[in-house]
Amino acid sequence: MALTKADLAETLFEKVGLSKRDAKETVEVFFEEIKQALESGEQVKLSGFGNFDLREKSERPGRNPKTGEDIPISARRVVTFKPGQKLKARVENLPVEK
């Protein structure tokens, strides 16, 4: 199961007491701020959670899996996430499901 923006809004509604409309808008604004910061080339640091960064990937050779033809993969910018120490510690202590 995945955590969705709707789930986050529902949690704000239940635990913080925001109206459902305000809770949904708060979640949307939060993610929009992160998107805008990244689009501006800024790092996003969420204390106790982790950091979002942009990384440049240079052009590299690739191959079309259907035809086997060599094709270049163009240079691009990608978003990376590095979890913070507190998040790492909480996740590392979870039991492994088999």
From Swiss-Prot:
Entry keywords, A to Z: DNA recombination, DNA-binding, Transcription, Transcription regulation, Translation regulation
Single GO MF annotation: structural constituent of chromatin
Any Gene Ontology CC annotation: cytosol
InterPro entries reported for this sequence: Hist_DNA-bd (IPR000119), Histone-like_DNA-bd_CS (IPR020816), IHF-like_DNA-bd_dom_sf (IPR010992), IHF_alpha (IPR005684)
Chain positions covered by the region annotation Disordered: 53-73
Task performed by this protein: This protein is one of the two subunits of integration host factor, a specific DNA-binding protein that functions in genetic recombination as well as in transcriptional and translational control.
Similarity-based family: Belongs to the bacterial histone-like protein family.
Subunit structure: Heterodimer of an alpha and a beta chain.
Protein name as it appears in the record: Integration host factor subunit alpha
Natural source organism: Aliivibrio fischeri (strain ATCC 700601 / ES114) (Vibrio fischeri)
